[in-house]
C-alpha cells in the first residue's frame, strides 16, 4: 500500500478512486490532482512509479486534508456554538443545521426515538 498524507491507499484500485480514501479529497479534486501530476486516471496504484507518487504527494501536501481539515471543521463548529448563533444552537442541541424538517424525520441527527407515554383517558 502506498502512503499519501498519512493514509494507506489501496494498491489494487484505480488512482482516482484510491485518492478519495483521503479525508478532504473527493472525485473532482482527485481528478485535478492527477491532471496536475500528469498521471492517467486509469492507472492502478501498484503501477505508479516512485516519481509519480512523489508528484502526487507534493500536490496533496499543498492541500488542507486529513487532520488539519478535521481540526478546522471542528473549530468552525465550536466557534458557531460559542457565539450562540442559530446554527450553533442547532449543533448544540444535535438537530439539523441546514433548515431540514424535524416533525417526522431527522432521525440521523436526533438519534433513536424516545417514546413519550400517553396520558390515560
UniProtKB/Swiss-Prot annotation:
Question: What Gene3D superfamilies does UniProt report for this protein, alphabetically?
Answer: 1.10.8.50, 30s ribosomal protein s13, domain 2
- Annotated region (Disordered) at 94-121
MF terms (GO), sorted A to Z: rRNA binding; structural constituent of ribosome; tRNA binding
Cite a GO CC annotation.
small ribosomal subunit
Identify the keywords attached in UniProt to this record, alphabetized.
Answer: Ribonucleoprotein, Ribosomal protein, RNA-binding, rRNA-binding, tRNA-binding
Which GO annotations describe the biological process of this protein? translation
Source superkingdom? Bacteria
Q: Which InterPro entries match?
A: Rbsml_uS13_C, Ribosomal_uS13, Ribosomal_uS13-like_H2TH, Ribosomal_uS13_bac-type, Ribosomal_uS13_CS
Compositionally biased region (Basic residues): 106-121
Which NCBIfam families would you find in this protein's record?
Answer: uS13_bact
Q: Which family is it part of?
A: Belongs to the universal ribosomal protein uS13 family.
How this chain assembles, per its entry, is: Part of the 30S ribosomal subunit. Forms a loose heterodimer with protein S19. Forms two bridges to the 50S subunit in the 70S ribosome.
Q: What job does the chain carry out?
A: Located at the top of the head of the 30S subunit, it contacts several helices of the 16S rRNA. In the 70S ribosome it contacts the 23S rRNA (bridge B1a) and protein L5 of the 50S subunit (bridge B1b), connecting the 2 subunits; these bridges are implicated in subunit movement. Contacts the tRNAs in the A and P-sites.
User: What protein is this chain from?
Assistant: Small ribosomal subunit protein uS13
What is the organism of origin for this protein? Geobacillus sp. (strain WCH70)
Amino acid at each position: 500500500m502506498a502512503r499519501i498524507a498519512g493514509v494507506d491507499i489501496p494498491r489494487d484500485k484505480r488512482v482516482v478512486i484510491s485518492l478519495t480514501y483521503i479525508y478532504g479529497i473527493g472525485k473532482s479534486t482527485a481528478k485535478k490532482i492527477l491532471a496536475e501530476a500528469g498521471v492517467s486516471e486509469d492507472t492502478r496504484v501498484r503501477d505508479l512509479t516512485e516519481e509519480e507518487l512523489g508528484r502526487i504527494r507534493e500536490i496533496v501536501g499543498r492541500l488542507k486534508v486529513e487532520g488539519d481539515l478535521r481540526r478546522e471543521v471542528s473549530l468552525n463548529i465550536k466557534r458557531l456554538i460559542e457565539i450562540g448563533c442559530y446554527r450553533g444552537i442547532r449543533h448544540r442541541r444535535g438537530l439539523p443545521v441546514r433548515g431540514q424538517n424535524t416533525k417526522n424525520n431527522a432521525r440521523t441527527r436526533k438519534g433513536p426515538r424516545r417514546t413519550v407515554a400517553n396520558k390515560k383517558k
